[in-house]
Amino acid sequence: MHEPEVAWLALEQENAAAFPILRRFSRNERHTASWQDFQLGRPEAEDFIRRWRDDPHTLTPYCLDRRSRSLLFVETAPGVDLCTVHPFFYQAQRLCAIRLHSVPMPVVLAMARDLPATLEQLILIHSTGRCGSTLLTQLLQTQGDMVTVSEPDLYTQLIHLPQQDALELAPVIRAATLFLRASLARNGYMALKMRGVVTYRAAMLAEALPGARSIFMYRHAADVVNSFITTMVPPWQFRLERALGIERLPTRWLMPSQSTLRLAPLLADRSYQATGLVGFFTMAWLSKMEAALAFQEQVGLAATLRYEALRRDPGGTLERLATALGLAGDLQPAALEKALGKDAQQGSSMASRQVRVLDQHDERRLRRLLAHHPRLNQPDVVLPGGLEP
């Protein structure tokens, strides 16, 4: 029997177990975290309660495993700062993990009762994606006692589940968040910057994490679409596909899987007639904007933030955001200047290429799609709750 099969059988057991990591598999950074990111050795039963009490700062929640009804933690060597090793937290976890711990959900829930339960110092950052939200997390670190975590993938898993299943996991998500906070933030503020698609589960997270404050960041639709395309395919490939007419094909033909609808739910509405990559990423932008608008009106966001405002007036925008969030830290101009002077995702495959591939025809297609929406019908629409004076 191969080692991964032995490991999988152990994951189905009821007790906590620790697995040595024999190998890390190469994963695209768009991949969602999973135990399958690793080749695991033979497991050893463990007392996870004691292990956590001995050294909680080397253990962080990595992902859920629904089949075994476990929360999986990665263990790293002492002194590793997962918030600085890589622009994305889930990638830092994968790169630095030395062991994987499988902890049954009942044990997780029981242990969480002994963790500090307050979530008033927790900030949830939702966004359209490709809009400067990673930069925002770096700017927030200039606000005194703040730990920022960029894209912990535990939350990304929720979009792959039916709404009811995600709701049933709310207690586990809350417990996992308390573990993450206890491991990284101790008693200070913690900001969790989610992948853009997690916006579709913003209401569920607000219910699971009472006291946390949510913000939403966005950007001009054409800039977001352009940035997504240039990180997904080489510019020459997109231009070639456009010249060959592939961009005129319906998006549902090019991306027919159910997972596509999870990324851009409004694609289910055939009246939009989306075509090509431009159509897909326009509908993804619109879907997230619609989800954020609904959340703002039904639950309430602490603030909405436009990338253009942040770039135009970073100091003033950050001051207003700090006020909206109740932060007490002082601005550090040198740290602000340093963060603004580099690509926040430098070192990852998602780093911006700074290339414009959309032409005037593409932007007209984008505007025609948006024109179908009753409220979000302009690429530079401004959401309520903004921070601009």
Q: Where does each model-flagged region fall?
A:
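Conserved phosphate-donor/acceptor-positioning beta-strand/loop module used by diverse small-molecule
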Residues: 208-230, 321
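Hydrophobic/aromatic beta-strand patches that form the interior of the parallel beta-sheet core
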Residues: 123, 213-216, 303-305
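A short acidic (Asp/Glu
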Residues: 135, 200-206, 225-229, 314-318
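PAPS-dependent sulfation machinery
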Residues: 82, 121, 128, 138-199, ...
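PAPS-dependent sulfotransferases, especially Golgi type II membrane carbohydrate sulfotransferases
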Residues: 1-113, 256-304, 309-389
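Short, solvent-exposed loop/turn segments at secondary-structure junctions
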Residues: 130-131, 153-155, 196-199, 220-224, ...
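Long, mid-chain structured domain cores
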Residues: 90-148, 152-154
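Short hydrophobic/aromatic-enriched beta-strand-loop microsegments
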Residues: 148-150, 212-219, 238, 330
